């Protein structure tokens, strides 16, 4: 038994919406499948995707503010005044859009001198 796709399509073009709906339900029942769109599955996959860029936020300078200012200056390349302003204005982003490894390195350096850091 050979299927003539063109004939089937022509028959479907002449069917009403109700007839097509019944056909879809019958096919789902007969072959134990669903005609649901895979959009929901794709959305769930995107939600679970690993984050590739991080922002390093200085949440609090801690007790050793001078050491934190020096560390911020080394990390960012900012001048002394800009580094001090950043530390004084905490919570502020020290670096934005960096890789996970770089973000963790920066976090470790800042926590080593007593700062509280959050990765976003």
Curated annotation (Swiss-Prot):
<dbReference type="Pfam" id="PF16320">
    <property type="entry name" value="Ribosomal_L12_N"/>
</dbReference>
<dbReference type="GO" id="GO:0003729">
    <property type="term" value="F:mRNA binding"/>
</dbReference>
<dbReference type="GO" id="GO:0006412">
    <property type="term" value="P:translation"/>
</dbReference>
<dbReference type="InterPro" id="IPR014719">
    <property type="entry name" value="Ribosomal_bL12_C/ClpS-like"/>
</dbReference>
<keyword id="KW-0687">Ribonucleoprotein</keyword>
<dbReference type="InterPro" id="IPR000206">
    <property type="entry name" value="Ribosomal_bL12"/>
</dbReference>
<comment type="function">
    <text>Forms part of the ribosomal stalk which helps the ribosome interact with GTP-bound translation factors. Is thus essential for accurate translation.</text>
</comment>
<dbReference type="GO" id="GO:0003735">
    <property type="term" value="F:structural constituent of ribosome"/>
</dbReference>
<dbReference type="Pfam" id="PF00542">
    <property type="entry name" value="Ribosomal_L12"/>
</dbReference>
<dbReference type="InterPro" id="IPR008932">
    <property type="entry name" value="Ribosomal_bL12_oligo"/>
</dbReference>
<dbReference type="GO" id="GO:0022625">
    <property type="term" value="C:cytosolic large ribosomal subunit"/>
</dbReference>
<comment type="similarity">
    <text>Belongs to the bacterial ribosomal protein bL12 family.</text>
</comment>
<protein>
    <recommendedName>
        <fullName>Large ribosomal subunit protein bL12</fullName>
    </recommendedName>
</protein>
<dbReference type="InterPro" id="IPR013823">
    <property type="entry name" value="Ribosomal_bL12_C"/>
</dbReference>
<keyword id="KW-0689">Ribosomal protein</keyword>
<dbReference type="InterPro" id="IPR036235">
    <property type="entry name" value="Ribosomal_bL12_oligo_N_sf"/>
</dbReference>
<comment type="subunit">
    <text>Homodimer. Part of the ribosomal stalk of the 50S ribosomal subunit. Forms a multimeric L10(L12)X complex, where L10 forms an elongated spine to which 2 to 4 L12 dimers bind in a sequential fashion. Binds GTP-bound translation factors.</text>
</comment>
